Design a protein with these regions (language model features):
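Short amphipathic alpha-helix used as the core "switch/output" element in two-component signaling
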Residues: 42, 64-79
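Short hydrophobic/Thr-rich beta-strand motif most characteristic of the beta2 strand and flanking loop
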Residues: 28-37, 43
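C-terminal output helix
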Residues: 92, 110-119
Length: 130
């Protein structure tokens, strides 16, 4: 990555959260990992992100809490790119995610090469209009 990209990762599975965080940090990103909805809401209120990776289903929350986080994130930071990820994907969830402003939708397990390609092809922070 030419410029450091600020990425929010939200997942309720610690292994996935740590794995994605590790891979993206090694690729040069500044990563904010959040284990669930409450941590994510706090991070969204405090910081602007270039990209967010949001799991749709978060334990301890409504069944599609990640979509609610997507809405909150886009309200606070409309230029943030969002990749929605889920192991429980349906066409309805995909349509809903895209309607709420997701840039991409990925089924789990995540193909890391595909994910890194998406991240590397994002417009850099300096090339985006404010």
């Amino acid at each position: 990555m030419a410029e450091e990209v600020h990425i929010l990762i939200v997942d309720d599975e610690p292994t996935i959260l740590l794995g994605l965080s590790h891979v993206l940090r090694r690729a040069g990103a500044d990563v904010t990992p959040c284990l669930g909805r409450d941590e994510a809401e706090e991070a969204i209120r405090k910081q602007v992100f270039d990209l967010a990776l949001l799991d749709v289903r978060l334990s301890g929350s409504e069944s599609h809490a990640g979509l609610d986080l997507l809405t909150l994130l886009k309200q606070r930071s409309p230029h943030t790119h969002v990749i929605v990820m889920t192991a429980y994907g349906t066409d309805e969830i995909r349509r809903e995610a895209m309607a709420r402003g997701a840039s991409h939708y990925c089924d789990k397990p995540i193909n890391l090469d595909h994910l890194l390609g998406l991240v590397k092809n994002l417009p850099t922070p300096s090339s985006r209009s404010s």
